[in-house]
C-alpha cells in the first residue's frame, strides 16, 4: 500500500486511520 506518513510503533494509527490506513510494519499504510 501507500505509506500514510504516520507511524504506529507506540500508538495506533489515528488521523490516517480515518482515511482507511492500517498498521503494517510499524507504519500506517493505505
UniProtKB/Swiss-Prot annotation:
A GO biological-process term: defense response
Keyword set, alphabetical order: Disulfide bond, Knottin, Plant defense
Keyword Cytoplasm: no
Pfam families registered for this protein in UniProt: Cyclotide
Residues joined by cross-link Cyclopeptide (Gly-Asp): 1-30
Description of post-translational modifications: This is a cyclic peptide.
Disulfide bond keyword on record: yes
Cited InterPro entries: Cyclotide (IPR005535), Cyclotide_bracelet_CS (IPR012323), Cyclotide_sf (IPR036146)
Source taxon at top rank: Eukaryota
Disulfide bonds: 4-21, 8-23, 13-28
Family the UniProt entry places it in: Belongs to the cyclotide family. Bracelet subfamily.
Entry's free-text remark on domains: The presence of a 'disulfide through disulfide knot' structurally defines this protein as a knottin.
Function: Probably participates in a plant defense mechanism.
Protein name: Kalata-B16
Amino acid at each position: 500500500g501507500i505509506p500514510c506518513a504516520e507511524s504506529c510503533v507506540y500508538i495506533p494509527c489515528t488521523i490516517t486511520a480515518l482515511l482507511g490506513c492500517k498498521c503494517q510494519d510499524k507504519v500506517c499504510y493505505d
